[in-house]
């Protein structure tokens, strides 16, 4: 983990309230595992005080560039969306433990399931798995057609299905509906998205090897503030820190 100023190479809107930013700097060389995230300070002013955790979508080590995707949900991300090419961003990272790429054997099939802004980490994950000789299938879930992004980026690595809750694009329904409808077969499931989606996947595929990337609000990003704790299945009093121990966990480890 390092703290550095990264240079904005580009910052553009790619879907409704969803932006893609490319940052450049030596800190990129510290990236090790798909599923890690960056903690960004969105302003040099006193407020907003807290950094924003943003997942890493793609890494280009040769160019020292990292791509992040974020949705404008409040003042912090609104300020981030205003950043222009050439500006500097105060970044802490890469943080967290990512997906277990090394545990997926060549020739196996990995089902990658993303919901909303949980889709971006699947891009780098797909790339790493394909390099290992793993077969990849994507199922991406969104609320509506205006929210859809990264379909083509995922498709270059494997079969890709898109579901929208309102049926305005792709398959109608939720990601679990698509998996059943298409009778998708897989050896391991890797997912990132909203808690209700993760909970549904955990329940439906309890007999499978499943890894979930948790989306929790974070304060410090380094495990000191206890803002992102998640209870485990061991007992009512046991917990893990999503920013430090995760954000990726085996499904049976965490209580949803």
Curated annotation (Swiss-Prot):
Nucleus recorded as keyword: no
Effect listed in the UniProt record for changing residue 225 to A: No iron-sulfur binding
Binding site for [2Fe-2S] cluster: 220, 225, 228, 243
Disruption phenotype: Decreased growth rate in pyrimidine-free medium, extreme derepression of the pyrimidine biosynthetic operon, and decreased, but detectable dihydroorotate dehydrogenase activity.
Annotated keywords: 2Fe-2S, Electron transport, FAD, Flavoprotein, Iron, Iron-sulfur, Metal-binding, Pyrimidine biosynthesis, Transport
Known pathway: Pyrimidine metabolism; UMP biosynthesis via de novo pathway; orotate from (S)-dihydroorotate (NAD(+) route): step 1/1
Result when mutating residue 228 to A: No iron-sulfur binding
Taxonomy, superkingdom: Bacteria
Cofactors, names only: [2Fe-2S] cluster; FAD
Manner of cofactor binding, per the entry note: Binds 1 [2Fe-2S] cluster per subunit.
InterPro entries for this protein: Cyt_c3_hydrogenase_gsu (IPR012165), Dihydroorotate_DH_ele_sf (IPR037117), Dihydroorotate_DH_Fe-S-bd (IPR019480), Dihydroorotate_DHASE_ETsu (IPR023455), FAD-bd_FR_type (IPR017927), FNR_nucleotide-bd (IPR039261), OxRdtase_FAD/NAD-bd (IPR001433), PyrK_electron_transfer (IPR050353)
Positions annotated to bind FAD: 52-55, 69-71, 76-77
GO BP of this protein: 'de novo' UMP biosynthetic process
Statement: the UniProt record of this protein carries the keyword Iron: yes
Record domain FAD-binding FR-type: where: 1-101
Gene Ontology molecular function, alphabetical: 2 iron, 2 sulfur cluster binding; electron transfer activity; flavin adenine dinucleotide binding; metal ion binding; oxidoreductase activity
Any Pfam family the entry gives: DHODB_Fe-S_bind
Function (record text): Responsible for channeling the electrons from the oxidation of dihydroorotate from the FMN redox center in the PyrD subunit to the ultimate electron acceptor NAD(+).
PANTHER family: DIHYDROOROTATE DEHYDROGENASE B (NAD(+)), ELECTRON TRANSFER SUBUNIT (PTHR43513), DIHYDROOROTATE DEHYDROGENASE B (NAD(+)), ELECTRON TRANSFER SUBUNIT-RELATED (PTHR43513:SF3)
NCBIfam families: PRK00054.1-2 (NF000797), PRK00054.1-4 (NF000799)
Family of the protein in this entry: Belongs to the PyrK family.
Subunit structure: Heterotetramer of 2 PyrK and 2 PyrD type B subunits.
Protein name, as recorded: Dihydroorotate dehydrogenase B (NAD(+)), electron transfer subunit
């Amino acid at each position: 983990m390092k703290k550095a100023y990264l240079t904005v190479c580009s910052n553009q809107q790619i879907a409704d309230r969803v932006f893609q930013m490319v940052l450049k700097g030596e800190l990129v060389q510290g990236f090790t595992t798909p599923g890690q995230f960056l903690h960004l300070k969105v302003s040099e002013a006193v407020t907003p005080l807290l950094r924003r955790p943003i997942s890493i979508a793609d890494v280009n080590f040769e160019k020292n560039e990292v791509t992040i995707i974020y949705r404008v949900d409040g003042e912090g991300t609104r300020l981030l969306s205003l950043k222009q090419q050439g500006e500097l961003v105060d970044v802490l990272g890469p943080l967290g433990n990512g997906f277990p790429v090394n545990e997926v054997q060549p020739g196996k099939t990995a089902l990658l399931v993303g919901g909303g802004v949980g889709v971006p980490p699947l891009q780098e994950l797909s790339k790493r798995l394909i390099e290992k000789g793993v077969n990849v299938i994507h199922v991406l879930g969104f609320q509506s057609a205006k929210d859809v992004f990264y379909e083509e980026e995922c498709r270059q690595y494997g079969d890709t299905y898109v579901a929208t809750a309102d049926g305005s694009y792709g398959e109608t329904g939720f990601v679990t509906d698509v998996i059943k409808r298409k009778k998708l077969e897989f050896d391991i499931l890797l997912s990132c998205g909203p808690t209700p989606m993760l909970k549904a996947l955990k329940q439906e595929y309890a007999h499978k090897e499943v890894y979930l990337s948790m989306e929790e609000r974070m304060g410090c990003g380094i495990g000191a503030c206890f803002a992102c704790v998640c209870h485990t299945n061991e007992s009512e009093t046991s917990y893990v820190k999503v920013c430090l121990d995760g954000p990726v966990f085996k499904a049976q480890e965490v209580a949803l």
